[in-house]
Amino acid sequence: NVSEDTSKTDSETLKDLHSEKKNVPTMGGIIILIAIIVSTVLWCDIFNIYILLVLFTAIWLGILGFFDDYIKLTQKHSSGLTSGSKLFFQCGLGLIIGLILYFHFKDIEEGTRLVIPFFKGVRPDLGAFYVLMVMFFIVGMSNAVNLTDGLDGLSIGCTVIAGMAFTLIAYIVGRVDFSSYLQVPYIAGAGELSIFCSALVGAGLGFMWFNCFPAQTFMGDVGSLPLGGILGIVAIIVKQELLIFFIGSIFIVEAVSVLLQVCVFKITRKRLFLCAPIHHHFQFKGWPETKVTMRFFIIAAIMALFSLITLKL
């Protein structure tokens, strides 16, 4: 149980650092989801299978996050849904999406193949393991974004940067000419995701106006869980799954830092980092919150640009 073990490694110092935030309203992610869904319904082809899948993912994880936040707010001293419960529903979603995409893609030449950055001629066919990969990316990214949501503006800012990158990638893979020139898989209908990702960016920027330091509202799990799931499924649909490790590098590092912290603590009873996720480690070293956030933004932007460059390499 990663989250519960992680909480045991936290210290009172973290509570002191964030003591002034205890009265800031949360569940602002509801507004993000509403903005994304309304924009998508207005401007996208809602009968497009990929649009339906990303909307389904957003709503499923949004409901899961809503109940988690609601329990935290209404039941004192509660940490919300158990980690096992959340993981069960996340895996359930991943399985459903994975099976749908597997049967949708299996008759398409590039359908269940994995595109390897830098090696455009190497595209191993995952076969039935494709379903497990889909589950891994949706569950992993959902939790990674959730773990990153610990500093004012950090998670939503990195999400906006990732959304911008996927907007361009979705447009490219949805066009025969561009995808042929760059030698990336052409995915008919995936161009609609560029509109969806644009809605994600717009909603994210609107929320960031109120979430940047000092935050006037937090997104809560109702925002972070679906945003992570969206990034995961978009990467899968546009057949650039491994690019998520560049585009979402901050999220990946945050999640890995927690896993390492837990594993090392269980084995040695000592902390690898002063506190996990890693953004708290830098806070403990004396970095101001805004400096941590801005430096993470810079890294996220550089890695997103690098991911776009790989399309031409």
PLM region descriptions:
Residues 21-33, 84-93, 289-299:
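Select subsegments of transmembrane alpha-helices in polytopic membrane proteins
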Residues 9-17, 111-126:
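Interfacial loop/helix-cap signal at membrane boundaries in integral membrane proteins
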Residues 1-3, 63-68:
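Alpha-helical transmembrane segments within multi-pass membrane transporters and channels
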Residues 72-82, 116-124, 288:
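Membrane interface segments of multi-pass transport proteins and intramembrane proteases
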Residues 5-9, 34-63, 97-114, 129-134, ...:
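Alpha-helical transmembrane segments
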Residues 22, 47-55, 74-89:
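Membrane-interfacial loop-to-helix junctions in multi-pass inner-membrane proteins
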Residues 81-92, 152-158:
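Alpha-helical transmembrane segments and their helix-start/interface "positive-inside/aromatic belt" motifs
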Residues 6-24, 79-86, 284:
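Juxtamembrane helix-capping/reentrant segments at transmembrane boundaries
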